[in-house]
Amino acid sequence: MKWTLAAVAAGCVASAALAQHGPIARARQVTASYTFDLVPSPDGRSAVLIRIVGGREQLFTMNMDGSGERQITREDADHEDPVWSPDGRRIAFVLVKDGRKVVTLINPDGTGAEAVTPANHSAIHPSFTPDGRAILYCTDDDLRPPEKNESEIYSIDLASKKVTTLISGGVNTFPVMSPDARKIAYRKIIGDMNSEVFVANADGSNPQNLTRHWTFEGWPAWSPDGKTIAYAGNRGNAGYQIFLMDADGGNPRLVAATEGRGTSPKWAPDGKTIFFTVCRESQERRGCDIMAAAL
């Protein structure tokens, strides 16, 4: 099926949750069902996304006009959290198979699969450093019942395979490094009913809570210029929506008003569009679609 990653018109929907400055984008659905987690390539010409095929999460690539869609994974396993290398030559993702989660690299055509993370780590949420030499990830070993109390953030050097612990203590997920490689944004879960977007130095020092809100907030994504962070939150009792804030946590504002659970914001390379996933009804991924909001 061919579809277009269309721009969206700006709306003027008021938000009681935040002091809103400027219009809120009225997001438009840009894919059919059974798709989620679209990530534009660094050159903005193509994208990788996840589609449900035969009950499994498989990776596809395509041109940004929706043409040339191609399935690049076929293993009887789930393939999650895709992300492009900065040079666009590799795609990292999480291979979920036989109870293990391994960050894996492949070429954009699906060849050259290479496991990256060590066997003793159940690894999730990979992201590349801006120079492409390392991958950040976190572990979910202790996120399963009955523990649910520990998730550390690591970096792994792709040449030496040296693993460095960056952030520990509590549940820390979704790490992503700023374009200037000086900061790491991530989600930290605080208690049973709260998570926040934090930023720390690149070595994990000096963590700062940017969102400071009693609800759930997470899925941070740096803008290409590093001045803004997109994130998802459920402020205002309206389900998860997509927000922006300045890189220091100031000026939080709702950017996309949607029906359903909006998460996983991803920036277009030109910084003019945010793609994200919206799941409806049961919140199962079979009910998920990819949306776009023009800024």
Annotate each predicted stretch with a short phrase.
Residues V13-A19:
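C-terminal segment of classical bacterial N-terminal signal peptides
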Residues A19-L295:
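Sequence signature of WD/YWTD-type beta-propeller architectures
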Residues A6-V13:
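Bacterial N-terminal signal peptides
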Residues M1-T4:
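Positively charged n-region of N-terminal signal peptides that target proteins for export
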